[in-house]
Amino acid sequence: MGLSEGEWQLVLNVWGKVEADLAGHGQDVLIRLFKGHPETLEKFDKFKHLKTEAEMKASEDLKKHGNTVLTALGGILKKKGHHDAELKPLAQSHATKHKIPIKYLEFISEAIIHVLHSRHPAEFGADAQGAMNKALELFRKDIATKYKELGFHG
């Protein structure tokens, strides 16, 4: 399940592109998530009222949250699988406060892959997509373990 050093390098190379515009990428990821899986919007009191893509694009709060999400994910990815310290508080808040099911993390992973491919087709070919999929799967597996430790089976 672990990634090779070469796979981590592919992940981090494309992540460098993401970091040039975290808020924009994050906004695109959340819009893709909410459009593809409208049920996920119900978990966000701040965004529930946003019904159209235009409303979502105009929301500074959505852009800020997208930045927060991708900043946290970037910190996790840079740990190359040694992310226990970063996952603990994230699992705690997502399991006990926000009650975000693992399935929703799969949905946002799909949105991330889609956005990276559409924004960076040259840097995000099949090998990089495969590596990112593995990295996101590792993240989900490890956060699911933390969820269970917290008694959340979402």
UniProtKB/Swiss-Prot annotation:
Kindly list the positions at which Phosphoserine occurs in this protein: S4
Q: What class of enzyme is it?
A: oxidoreductase
Q: Which Gene3D superfamilies match?
A: 6.10.140.2100, 6.10.140.2110
Q: Which SUPFAM superfamilies does this entry report, sorted A to Z? A: Globin-like
InterPro entries with a match to the protein in the record: Globin, Globin-like_sf, Myoglobin
Question: Which family is annotated?
Answer: Belongs to the globin family.
Its name, as the record gives it, is: Myoglobin
